[in-house]
């Protein structure tokens, strides 16, 4: 079933987040998905958008040759950086696109990049878990949410949290970031 979906008509690449955005943890079929993409030469972009608000993300890129690109935004771990649109992209091979062009002609927003670098220098990848772990556990407990590896997501049930279903049957991801304000 999964192979049929991944090999869908016109599929030229796969974008997958880690942790997976719908579950708040690494996708349960991540290994299988990567094997299928490798076997069928489907290039993968690994989106680490939740990197700075997640734990247990350990991916050895050497184990997954289909992963050709890794991206990471700094907007989720660092409040206010969403206004600066700053992140990092790593590619195995040169990509002739708008990002490369802006970098080559030195038109990237240096102020935003410098701000992102300062945040990374001053806050560890574990900062948000260290700061919000206790509040996260309390909010999840008070709202009957299952913990995830992403400090802003809890998983609910179909009775109280049906409105939070994002398309995966039986999955109800609840964003609790507003309840974590300190």
Language-model region placement:
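PLP-dependent class I/II
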Residues: 1-182
